[in-house]
Amino acid sequence: MLLALALLLAFLPPASQKSSNLEGRTKSVTRPTGSSAVITCDLPVENAVYTHWYLHQEGKAPQRLLYYDSYNSRVVLESGISREKYHTYASTGKSLKFILENLIERDSGVYYCATWDR
């Protein structure tokens, strides 16, 4: 029997260096174990320089998984994070995709994208 996996996705749009206001939206996704999930981060600015992806699990501090450097078109993973597990890419100038592969129960949590325009 496949177990269901619930992901709560919280998106934090970019915060300009000129503003401290952040607005967010959340979306709940449930996927069976062994499957994949794709999350879209919509950016209010074209080609934000750095977009970070975080996982926050109950009782733990948020963990940065990786970030996307749009200036150099590269993905930088945190130490111990598997390239086979997490991927990200720019799907448009104002949108980033984050892919979680081969989901397991330990992947449950709140995923955040956070970025800035400078």
From Swiss-Prot:
A GO CC annotation given for this chain: external side of plasma membrane
Compartment annotation: Cell membrane
Biological process, per Gene Ontology: adaptive immune response; innate immune response
Pfam families: V-set
Keyword Heme part of the UniProt annotation: no
UniProt keyword Nuclease, yes or no: no
Signal peptide residue numbers: 1-17
Domain Ig-like, first and last residues per copy: 18-118
Record keywords: Adaptive immunity, Cell membrane, Disulfide bond, Immunity, Immunoglobulin domain, Innate immunity, Membrane, Receptor, Signal, T cell receptor
SUPFAM superfamilies in UniProt: Immunoglobulin
Domain of life, per lineage: Eukaryota
Main location, first listed in the record: membrane
Disulphide bridges, residue numbers: C41-C113
PROSITE patterns, per the entry: IG_LIKE
Subunit structure comment from the entry: Gamma-delta TR is a heterodimer composed of a gamma and delta chain; disulfide-linked. The gamma-delta TR is associated with the transmembrane signaling CD3 coreceptor proteins following the stoichiometry: a single gamma-delta TR heterodimer associates with one CD3D-CD3E heterodimer, one CD3G-CD3E heterodimer and one CD247 homodimer forming a stable octameric structure. Upon activation, gamma-delta TR complex associates with FCER1G to initiate intracellular signaling.
PANTHER family per the UniProt record, alphabetical: T CELL RECEPTOR GAMMA VARIABLE 8, T-CELL RECEPTOR GAMMA CHAIN
Purpose: V region of the variable domain of T cell receptor (TR) gamma chain that participates in the antigen recognition. Gamma-delta TRs recognize a variety of self and foreign non-peptide antigens frequently expressed at the epithelial boundaries between the host and external environment, including endogenous lipids presented by MH-like protein CD1D and phosphoantigens presented by butyrophilin-like molecule BTN3A1. Upon antigen recognition induces rapid, innate-like immune responses involved in pathogen clearance and tissue repair.
Name this protein carries in UniProt: T cell receptor gamma variable 8
